């Protein structure tokens, strides 16, 4: 039995009417995962035993008719802690780490009756934009297995796009939800910083990281955000939940909504077909009654440089805890304490992680702190101020999610800077702590193009409103890759 093309609401109705049980749905999902896994490599761990135990308990308690997520399977990125399920961050360093607690986002999802079916592959410690730095091998793009799926939440995006699961969780530090969502033709949202607790997320850049949802459609994405968003005493940066239902504006028209189109987002380095797709999308929003006008975000061009100083500096601090002593990988060829530290970290971390630790350590070092880290913080403030000026007059910002569609596997590994520039359009959103969504907006070379909508802080419901209006009047979200059963 397969439920690939059923929406969450359709699955909920089947569960409530007892046409299917949570156990049957979970078993079908596990079969979907396994049948596509050899082609995609989107999972690090398939949690079959734990998922079936959860499903049985939900069946025995009964499906909650008022809770649309009760009994629905969920895949979780492998840097988000799951009680009793390996959480490796796709690194040799944590190859055997099994948390004894759930991340708050996972605990919230379980409280809603969601069933964790596995941990998805990712760039190691979320450091990468292609899904290729994983210790467990690269994930493949759902549309073309010779292409990258984007990163770092590579497996979470590919799993949803391919029909392995309907919903998944990722994390976004510089575009790690939105870019793979764009490359795989699905909906991915980075919430406002603080909307979802970071407790239980293996930290990369603590001032940038945010957990968020993947789904095939806008409404399903919002339903998952409803489940995971919460204020949390265990995360001092979490914010009070302002709104009970992030779907509240879905279905409302967008007549009179003011949308800004930054000229910098369609400038140098943007693929011509991607640019054309976004300009066509802007015209579509105008047909729906929105007002679209060109604006400038003059400091956005410095975003990549600022990000790689700040994020790497925070990573060099956060990753100090992985020392071969308390948990994770320990080198066997060490004869003293210093060698345990050095050898365990040298052998346990991959090349990209070590590159960023060294970059961050350099940026924080005596004599360079003022020139790099402090200055990056000052430019970050200018980027934030650019957004504030635009949002004084506009409701949302529109642009491409990525400068290109998915590129060939192993084509940029020799050129880290070129890969870093692929996050040019998503990074400023993290630096400013803003919400941003990627939705399918067209195709180029047979591969999905993502449209990014950015809002002021705590404007997720407005972002969902505009995204849903676009989705309802286009059919890009209905296109499916061959592995899902589509014609493309």
Curated annotation (Swiss-Prot):
Q: Which reaction does it catalyse?
A: L-glutamyl-tRNA(Gln) + L-glutamine + ATP + H2O = L-glutaminyl-tRNA(Gln) + L-glutamate + ADP + phosphate + H(+)
Q: Which InterPro entries does the annotation name?
A: Amidase (IPR000120), Amidase_CS (IPR020556), Amidase_dom (IPR023631), AS_sf (IPR036928), GatA (IPR004412)
GO molecular function terms listed in the Swiss-Prot or TrEMBL record: ATP binding; glutaminyl-tRNA synthase (glutamine-hydrolyzing) activity
Q: Which EC numbers does the record give?
A: 6.3.5.7
Q: Can the keyword Nucleotide-binding be found in this entry's annotation?
A: yes
Its GO biological process terms? translation
Q: Where is the active site?
A: 77, 152, 176
One Gene Ontology cellular component? glutamyl-tRNA(Gln) amidotransferase complex
Under the heading NCBIfam families, the entry gives: gatA
This protein is called Glutamyl-tRNA(Gln) amidotransferase subunit A
């Amino acid at each position: 039995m397969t439920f690939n093309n059923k929406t969450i609401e359709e699955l909920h109705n089947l569960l409530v009417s007892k046409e299917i049980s949570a156990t049957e749905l979970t078993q079908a999902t596990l079969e979907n995962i396994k049948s596509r896994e050899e082609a995609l490599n989107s999972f690090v761990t398939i949690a079959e035993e734990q998922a079936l135990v959860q499903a049985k308990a939900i069946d025995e308690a009964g499906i909650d008719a008022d809770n649309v997520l009760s009994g629905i399977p969920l895949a979780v990125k492998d840097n988000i802690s799951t009680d009793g399920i390996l959480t490796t961050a796709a690194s040799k360093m944590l190859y055997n780490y099994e948390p004894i607690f759930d991340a708050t986002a996972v605990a919230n999802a379980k409280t809603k009756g969601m069933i964790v079916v596995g941990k998805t592959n990712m760039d190691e410690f979320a450091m990468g934009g292609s899904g290729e730095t994983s210790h467990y091998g690269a994930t493949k793009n759902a549309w073309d297995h010779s292409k990258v799926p984007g990163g770092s939440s590579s497996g979470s995006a590919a799993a949803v796009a391919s029909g392995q699961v309907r919903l998944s969780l990722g994390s976004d530090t510089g575009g790690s939800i939105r870019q793979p969502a764009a490359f795989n033709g699905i909906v991915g949202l980075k919430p406002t910083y603080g909307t979802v607790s970071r407790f239980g997320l293996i930290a990369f850049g603590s001032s940038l990281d945010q957990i968020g949802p993947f789904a095939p459609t806008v409404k399903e994405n919002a339903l998952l955000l409803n489940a995971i968003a919460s204020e949390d005493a265990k995360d001092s940066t979490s914010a009070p939940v302002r709104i009970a239902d992030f779907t509240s504006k879905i279905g409302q028209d967008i007549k009179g909504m003011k949308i800004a189109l930054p000229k910098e987002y369609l400038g140098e380095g943007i693929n011509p077909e991607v640019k054309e797709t976004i300009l066509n999308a802007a015209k579509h929003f105008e047909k729906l009654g929105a007002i679209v006008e060109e604006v400038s975000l003059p400091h956005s061009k410095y975003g990549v440089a600022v990000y790689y100083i700040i994020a790497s500096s925070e990573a060099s601090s956060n990753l100090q805890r992985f020392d071969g002593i308390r948990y994770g990988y320990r080198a066997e060829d060490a004869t003293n304490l210093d060698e345990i530290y050095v050898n365990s970290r040298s052998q346990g971390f991959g090349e990209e992680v070590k590159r960023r630790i060294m970059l961050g350590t350099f940026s924080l070092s005596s004599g360079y702190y003022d020139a790099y880290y402090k200055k990056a913080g000052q430019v970050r403030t200018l980027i934030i101020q650019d957004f504030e000026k635009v949002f004084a007059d506009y409701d949302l910002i529109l642009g491409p999610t990525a400068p290109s569609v998915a590129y060939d596997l192993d084509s940029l590994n020799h050129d880290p800077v070129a890969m870093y520039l692929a996050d040019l359009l998503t990074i400023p959103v993290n630096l400013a702590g803003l919400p941003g969504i990627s939705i399918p907006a067209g195709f180029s070379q047979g591969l999905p193009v993502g449209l990014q909508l950015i809002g002021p802080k705590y404007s997720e419901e407005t972002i969902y409103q505009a995204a849903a209006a676009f989705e309802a009047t286009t059919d890009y979200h209905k296109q499916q890759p061959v592995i899902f059963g589509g014609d493309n």
